[in-house]
């Protein structure tokens, strides 16, 4: 029988000092011997997705203590990618994922916690906590802050739905008046919560449901809705049930590595492809798989992308639907139900929401779908749950409204979620391309690519940084038919693998959204759409071919054939490579780029791998 980890610091005379300190935190005599549950919160006033999380730890703690545990809360950092975007702050976003993972590991292991509840929400916080949870392999439940309501405003007497990307595009579009731009800006992000489309934060929170580590509704229930309160309380109850199963019954199926196994990672990627999730999810799933010792690679993603249809289309891929609409259609469980009926899902995997013979968290995804898939459930409470809707009232407060849609969206032919027969497309929303530009692959969010752009041939317009590319786009240097190449923005070369939302937004605002392509060894915001190809691996700083592209080179992109090719002979490429090597210490470095890189970022860059490995640390440099 596994012994409580916390016994290390609570049992025996030699731990009298530790017990004295525990007592100073509020632990009583009769508490010693109970499991200590760490609550990793991420409250901050910097981030709308986290501004409402201050009291969520106390809510979870109340359920833990009622179930017989000791709850101890701590906080991690949280970077807002939207606020950090477009300047040097974006260099810190992806590296913050590793810091979050490490900080959770440090706190949990330093204090010998027995189990963990992760309260996350935005772009790098959920992935960082996921990496830590799988690294630690102690009972865990995830519960996020939830998505914000979609913005709404009237323009030219027409009511339109908005999100963050609309504000960015309007701000850069000279055809939009100052008055309309300001109106869009003020309406785009009306409430607390993660940005309202299928951007990175919401994509990752949805994927925790598919991995089996969070409760139904986690990825789609609005941050403002009163029903979300129960998710926090149930997370506390569930983690205690998992802890008791593991420590009292020696049931290893309660551990995250046995829940989030290879099949669960396939389920998560299947969901991601079907819902056209952010391309960043590829990066984070690859990183999480390594922490779980699961052999899940780009090859698996490529294989699955050819099999899974696109069943759910959400902003930024369409202005019609946002996360509140996904929830109305049944949320993640609604999409998984359609995937199951299409024969594309493993339903024999464990799930924290599944009960078996009255034992919480001991059943499989099959039983979760039977209860929570709105197309098959007979539970009226579940249907009521998925009818939770927006109030349309600006607020930073959680659980501030209890509005309901008049009905569920069960239209699987023309609704937000489709059946396989009526899919938006029979190939999914993400694809892996490869070729001499990206020998180890690159990623495109096909859900956001217009059909006319599925194949594209153009001339390279090369930039050594995102800043230079933005200047080139806004300055009129980029013209129709160009393939904008932004390099040395990968994990090592940036460092930090910046998001390229501003270049893609500015291409749209200049009327070039369908007339140009963009490729980069950096990454894209979940808010990106258009022919935007990121994660080029190997990156330029690691000797990738993207570093050898020259202005005017012909680049051929063929998404149906999963191909990206630089139309330059091998002889010429070898000559360019030799020339690069001849530069010695200056080889594989950007030409003329002026950028301050702090010591902290240099430390990250020293160990960073390319995107095809999840941009995680190169373990070979750390092992003896």
Curated annotation (Swiss-Prot):
MF term (GO), any: dihydroxy-acid dehydratase activity
Residues at the active site: 525
Gene Ontology CC annotations of this record: cytosol
Keyword field: 2Fe-2S, Amino-acid biosynthesis, Branched-chain amino acid biosynthesis, Iron, Iron-sulfur, Lyase, Magnesium, Metal-binding
SUPFAM superfamilies, per database record: IlvD/EDD N-terminal domain-like (SSF143975), LeuD/IlvD-like (SSF52016)
Cofactor(s) recorded in Swiss-Prot or TrEMBL: [2Fe-2S] cluster; Mg(2+)
Domain of life: Bacteria
Catalytic activity: (2R)-2,3-dihydroxy-3-methylbutanoate = 3-methyl-2-oxobutanoate + H2O; (2R,3R)-2,3-dihydroxy-3-methylpentanoate = (S)-3-methyl-2-oxopentanoate + H2O
Chain positions recorded as [2Fe-2S] cluster binding sites: 122, 195
InterPro entries per UniProt: Dihydro-acid_dehy_C, DihydroxyA_deHydtase, DiOHA_6PGluconate_deHydtase_CS, ILV_EDD_C, ILV_EDD_N, IlvD/EDD_N
Transmembrane segments: none
Secretion signal span: none
Residues found modified as N6-carboxylysine: 124
Annotated residues for binding of Mg(2+): 81, 123-124, 499
GO BP terms: isoleucine biosynthetic process; L-valine biosynthetic process
Enzyme class: lyase
Pathway: Amino-acid biosynthesis; L-isoleucine biosynthesis; L-isoleucine from 2-oxobutanoate: step 3/4; Amino-acid biosynthesis; L-valine biosynthesis; L-valine from pyruvate: step 3/4
Cofactor note: Binds 1 [2Fe-2S] cluster per subunit. This cluster acts as a Lewis acid cofactor.
Assembly with partners or alone: Homodimer.
Family note: Belongs to the IlvD/Edd family.
Purpose of the protein: Functions in the biosynthesis of branched-chain amino acids. Catalyzes the dehydration of (2R,3R)-2,3-dihydroxy-3-methylpentanoate (2,3-dihydroxy-3-methylvalerate) into 2-oxo-3-methylpentanoate (2-oxo-3-methylvalerate) and of (2R)-2,3-dihydroxy-3-methylbutanoate (2,3-dihydroxyisovalerate) into 2-oxo-3-methylbutanoate (2-oxoisovalerate), the penultimate precursor to L-isoleucine and L-valine, respectively.
Protein name in UniProt: Dihydroxy-acid dehydratase
Organism in which the protein naturally occurs: Shewanella baltica (strain OS185)
Lineage: Bacteria, Pseudomonadati, Pseudomonadota, Gammaproteobacteria, Alteromonadales
Gene (UniProt): ilvD
């Amino acid at each position: 029988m596994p012994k409580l980890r916390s016994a290390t610091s609570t049992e025996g005379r030699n731990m009298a000092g530790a017990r004295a300190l525990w007592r100073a935190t509020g632990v009583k005599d009769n508490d010693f011997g109970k499991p200590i549950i760490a609550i990793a919160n991420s409250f901050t006033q910097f981030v709308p997705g986290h501004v409402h999380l201050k009291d969520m730890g106390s809510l979870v703690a109340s359920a833990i203590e009622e179930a017989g545990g000791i709850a101890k809360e701590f906080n991690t950092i949280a970077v807002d990618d939207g606020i950090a975007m477009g300047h040097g702050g974006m260099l810190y976003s992806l590296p913050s994922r590793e810091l979050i993972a490490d900080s959770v590991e440090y706190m949990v292991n330093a204090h010998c916690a027995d189990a963990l509840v992760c309260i996350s929400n935005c772009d790098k916080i959920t992935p960082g906590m996921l990496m830590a949870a799988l690294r630690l392999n102690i009972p865990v439940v995830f519960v996020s802050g939830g998505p914000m309501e979609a913005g709404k405003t009237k323009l030219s007497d027409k009511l339109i739905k908005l999100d963050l990307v609309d504000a960015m595009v309007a701000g850069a579009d000279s055809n939009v008046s100052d008055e309309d731009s300001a109106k869009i800006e003020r309406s785009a992000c009306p409430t607390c919560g993660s940005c309202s489309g299928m951007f990175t934060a919401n994509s990752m929170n949805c994927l925790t449901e598919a991995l089996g580590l969070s409760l139904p509704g986690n990825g789609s229930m609005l941050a403002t809705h009163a029903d979300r309160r129960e998710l926090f309380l149930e997370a506390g109850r569930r983690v205690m049930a998992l802890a008791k199963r593991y420590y009292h019954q020696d049931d290893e199926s309660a551990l995250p590595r046995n829940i989030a196994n290879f099949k669960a990672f396939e389920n998560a990627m299947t969901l991601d492809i079907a819902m056209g999730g952010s391309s960043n999810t590829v990066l984070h799933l690859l990183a999480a798989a390594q922490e779980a010792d699961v052999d899940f690679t780009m090859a698996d993603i490529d294989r699955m992308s050819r099999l899974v249809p696109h069943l759910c289309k959400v902003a930024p891929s369409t202005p019609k639907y946002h996360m509140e609409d996904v929830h109305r259609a049944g949320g993640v469980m609604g999409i998984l139900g359609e995937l199951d009926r299409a024969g594309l899902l493993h339903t024999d995997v464990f799930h924290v929401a599944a009960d078996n013979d009255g034992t919480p968290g001991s059943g499989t995804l099959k039983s979760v779908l039977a209860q929570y898939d709105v197309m098959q459930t007979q539970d009226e409470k579940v249907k009521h749950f998925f009818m939770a809707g927006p109030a349309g009232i600006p607020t930073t407060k959680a659980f501030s409204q209890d509005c309901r849609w008049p009905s569920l969206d069960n239209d699987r032919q023309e609704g937000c979620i489709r059946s396989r027969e009526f899919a938006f497309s029979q190939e999914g929303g993400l694809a892996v391309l490869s070729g001499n530009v990206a020998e180890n692959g690159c990623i495109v969010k096909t859900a956001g690519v217009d059909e006319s752009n599925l194949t594209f041939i153009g001339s390279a317009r090369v930039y050594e940084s995102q800043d230079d590319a933005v200047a080139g786009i806004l300055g009129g240097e980029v013209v129709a038919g160009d393939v904008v190449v932004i390099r040395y923005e990968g994990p090592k070369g940036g460092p930090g693998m910046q998001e390229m939302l501003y270049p893609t937004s500015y291409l749209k605002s200049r009327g070039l959204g369908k007339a140009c392509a963009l490729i980069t060894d950096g990454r894209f915001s979940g808010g990106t759409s258009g022919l935007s190809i990121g994660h080029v691996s190997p990156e330029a700083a690691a000797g990738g071919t993207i570093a050898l592209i020259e202005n005017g080179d012909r680049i051929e992109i063929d998404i149906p054939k999963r191909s990206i090719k630089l139309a330059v002979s091998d002889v010429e490429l070898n000559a360019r490579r030799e020339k690069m090597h001849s530069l010695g210490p200056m080889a594989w470095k950007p030409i003329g780029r002026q950028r301050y890189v702090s010591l902290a970022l240099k430390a990250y860059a020293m160990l960073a791998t390319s995107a095809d490995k999840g941009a995680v640390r190169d373990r070979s440099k750390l092992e003896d």
